[in-house]
């Protein structure tokens, strides 16, 4: 993965490398390279260049309007003081280190992009650039690096269902072998495609909701982990389409029931040592890891504007559904917003991590990871104390006892999340004013777009957007 921002004309050796890659891709029958980024609403937007134009894209980028930073999921446009107008242009620069032949889309390759201005400066609303900057800052100021992974949950619907209806393509029970058998051919093709693309799959299994599945991948650096989240979903869509199926990663496809999550797994490391294991603090954490977790916990209400950013997210964030809707943490407690994963004895030094549960796949993965890391670093820098651990379901706590222990419900509406984000100076500073204002404008636009709809209407509005 490229560690520096693109420059007009290309980084040293970049154009020559792109020329060589173009020849290799052409020789393998690749005709087009998909250039992908994720907008503020969490939608993956793309442009394609013919394989022969890859070197030109590496040198001078590909034009795209900055207006997409204030697109809503339904493609309507809101605005800020800086973004949302028809003016201006940006350049999309492919990260050649992440260039991937798409095994499920013969003739195609894929690459994530960084966005810079026509003058060659980093675009202030580029989430990938912001995440890279925050990660670099952590290494410079604290000597800390991170490993991250994003879980991917989705539902599989019948491709021949009428209109925008969701009809589960499988009927087996949650986590059941019958469901795996029903999707056997498609699942085998998916695993083969991911392996061919270099994606390290840890697990694949049926999930709880009707027609729901999950894939978990190995941990990488945060930018690469976010890239993989986008690539995995692209691959799932492509494989499923070849089998006549329709998939959705939306937080909720129905007004009731369990939704799709996108839990973040994150661990902080220094000099090759995992700070979440081998320490003398609770759950084997080091004192620094405890403070990092405390920072994430303290910023959780505002974080939901970035990690659970859709009106449909609220249909998923319900108590007692393992969605983590209370400001609580616990060791292997799946109802807590923050789950401390200690790992199995013998591999804890590499397996221990923090799982952030109030996250779904309507989130821009770059912004979600950037904001969670920024929150944790704030706690680490201030040596923030981690409150008492919670066991069991926080929803069952007596209200007075919950209040005394600092356990409170996360924002119930998207506008409440925005209000918390507005007052969170740490997160706003981490994103920068241009991007922070875009987040607010897009979230309020999404909330307004579904005003008056019941839960079923909200679910239907976002069912096939993600």
From Swiss-Prot:
Pfam annotation, one family: Gln-synt_C
Metabolic or biological pathway: Amine and polyamine degradation; putrescine degradation; Amine and polyamine degradation; spermidine degradation; Amine and polyamine degradation; spermine degradation
Mutant phenotype after disruption: Normal growth on defined Evans agar supplemented with ammonium chloride, sodium nitrate, monosodium L-glutamate or L-glutamine, but no growth when supplemented with high concentration 200 mM putrescine, 50 mM cadaverine, 25 mM spermidine or 25 mM spermine as a sole nitrogen source. Defective formation of aerial mycelium and deficient sporulation on defined Evans agar supplemented with glutamate. Nitrate, glutamine and ammonium supplementation of this medium results in increased actinorhodin (blue antibiotic) and prodigiosin (red antibiotic) production.
Binding locations of L-glutamate: 259, 316, 334
Positions contributing to ATP binding: 202, 267, 334, 339
Induction: Expression is induced by exogenous putrescine, cadaverine and spermidine. Induced also by ammonium limitation, but only with a simultaneous low glucose level. Transcriptionally regulated by EpuRII.
Cofactor dependence: Mg(2+)
Keyword Metal-binding on entry: yes
Cofactor: binding comment: Binds 2 Mg(2+) ions per subunit.
Record's function text: Involved in the catabolism of polyamines. Catalyzes the ATP-dependent gamma-glutamylation of polyamines. Substrates include putrescine, cadaverine, spermidine and spermine, with a preference for long-chain polyamines spermidine and spermine. Is not able to compensate for the loss of glutamine synthetases (GSs). No complementation of the L-glutamine auxotrophy of an E.coli glnA mutant. Involved in morphological differentiation and in the production of secondary metabolites.
Protein's name in the database: Gamma-glutamylpolyamine synthetase GlnA3
């Amino acid at each position: 993965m490229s560690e520096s921002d693109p420059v007009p004309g290309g980084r040293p050796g970049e154009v020559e490398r792109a020329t060589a890659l173009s020849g290799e891709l052409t020789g393998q029958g690749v005709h087009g390279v998909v250039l992908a980024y994720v907008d503020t609403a969490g939608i993956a937007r793309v442009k394609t260049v013919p394989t022969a134009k890859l070197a030109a894209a590496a040198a001078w980028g590909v034009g795209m309007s900055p207006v997409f930073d204030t697109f809503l999921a339904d493609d309507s446009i809101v605005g800020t003081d800086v973004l949302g107008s028809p003016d201006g242009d940006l350049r999309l620069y492919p990260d050649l280190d992440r260039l991937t032949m798409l095994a499920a889309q013969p003739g195609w390759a894929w690459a994530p992009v960084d966005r810079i201005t026509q003058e060659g400066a980093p675009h202030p609303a580029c989430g990938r650039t912001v995440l890279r900057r925050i990660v670099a800052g952590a290494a410079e100021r604290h000597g800390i690096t991170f490993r991250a992974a994003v879980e991917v949950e989705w539902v599989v619907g019948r491709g021949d269902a009428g209109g925008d209806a969701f009809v589960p393509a499988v009927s087996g029970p949650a986590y059941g072998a019958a469901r795996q058998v029903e999707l056997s051919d498609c699942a085998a093709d998916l695993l083969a495609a991911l392996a061919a693309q270099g994606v390290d799959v840890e697990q694949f299994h049926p999930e709880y909701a009707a027609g729901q599945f999950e894939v978990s991948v190995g941990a990488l650096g945060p930018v690469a982990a976010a890239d993989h989240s986008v690539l995995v979903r692209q691959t799932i869509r492509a494989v499923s389409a070849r089998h006549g199926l329709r998939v959705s990663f939306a937080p909720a496809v129905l007004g009731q029931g369990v939704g799709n999550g996108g839990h973040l797994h994150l661990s902080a490391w220094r000099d090759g040592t995992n700070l979440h294991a081998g320490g003398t603090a609770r759950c084997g954490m080091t004192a620094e890891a405890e403070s990092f977790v405390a920072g994430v916990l303290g910023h959780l209400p505002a974080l939901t504007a970035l990690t659970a950013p859709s009106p449909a997210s609220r249909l998923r964030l319900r108590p007692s559904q393992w969605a983590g809707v209370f400001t609580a943490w616990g060791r292997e407690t799946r109802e807590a917003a923050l789950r401390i994963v200690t790992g199995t004895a013998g591999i804890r030094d590499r397996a221990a991590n923090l799982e952030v549960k109030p996250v779904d796949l309507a989130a821009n993965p770059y912004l979600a990871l950037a904001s969670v890391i920024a929150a944790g670093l704030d706690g680490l820098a201030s040596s923030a104390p981690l409150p008492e651990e919670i066991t069991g379901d926080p929803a069952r706590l007596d209200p007075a006892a919950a209040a005394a222990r600092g356990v409170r419900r996360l924002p119930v509406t998207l506008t409440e999340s925005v209000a918390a984000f507005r007052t969170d100076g740490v997160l706003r500073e981490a994103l920068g004013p241009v991007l922070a204002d875009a987040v607010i404008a897009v979230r309020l636009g999404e909330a307004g777009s579904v005003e008056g709809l019941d839960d079923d209407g909200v679910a239907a509005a976002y069912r096939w957007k993600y």
